[in-house]
């Protein structure tokens, strides 16, 4: 619950208005899809939602339970997942999926384009650069991998796109 408000009326009735935290991501685990909020709490299971949220895979969850925080992964990976899904949500980027390899390097899928983000370092800068690229329309109609692993490290502001 993000917030609640109570309204009292003269006829002695009470109206309670509850606002939930928005769902910002999903996890596929044991043939189910679990949806979580920006704090990592699992809010729903196997529902149809109107908004597009990224599906996280590539992480080794040992337990996912409704109304509890995502568990069973290294806390640093859980923090990375939450940071990335929150940045995507805040910047209104609708990723199809998010995956992590064994070195905890993040890759997001945006239709036919995969975006290799690398490690958690400078993730805010990487997402800002991705926003600028998406806004420019440079990726429209392309298929391949956009490399932003080194973005924000001070070495260069350019990026590499490998066409398929």
Residue ranges and their predicted role:
Residues 3-164:
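Charged, solvent-exposed interaction patches on well-folded alpha/beta domains
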């Amino acid at each position: 619950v993000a917030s609640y408000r109570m309204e009292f009326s003269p006829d002695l009735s009470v109206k309670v208005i509850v606002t939930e935290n928005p769902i910002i991501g999903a996890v596929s685990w044991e043939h189910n899809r679990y949806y979580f909020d920006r704090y990592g709490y699992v809010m729903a299971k196997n529902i149809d939602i109107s908004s597009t949220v990224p599906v996280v895979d590539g992480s080794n969850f040992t337990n996912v339970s409704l109304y509890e925080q995502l568990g069973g992964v290294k806390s640093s990976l859980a923090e990375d997942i939450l940071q990335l899904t929150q940045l995507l949500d805040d910047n209104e980027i609708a990723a199809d999926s998010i995956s992590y390899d064994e070195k905890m390097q993040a890759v997001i899928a945006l239709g036919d384009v995969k975006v290799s983000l690398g490690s958690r370092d400078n993730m805010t800068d990487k997402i800002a650069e991705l926003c600028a690229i998406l806004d420019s329309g440079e990726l429209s109609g392309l298929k391949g991998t956009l490399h932003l692993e080194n973005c924000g490290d001070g070495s260069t502001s350019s990026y590499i796109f490998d066409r398929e």
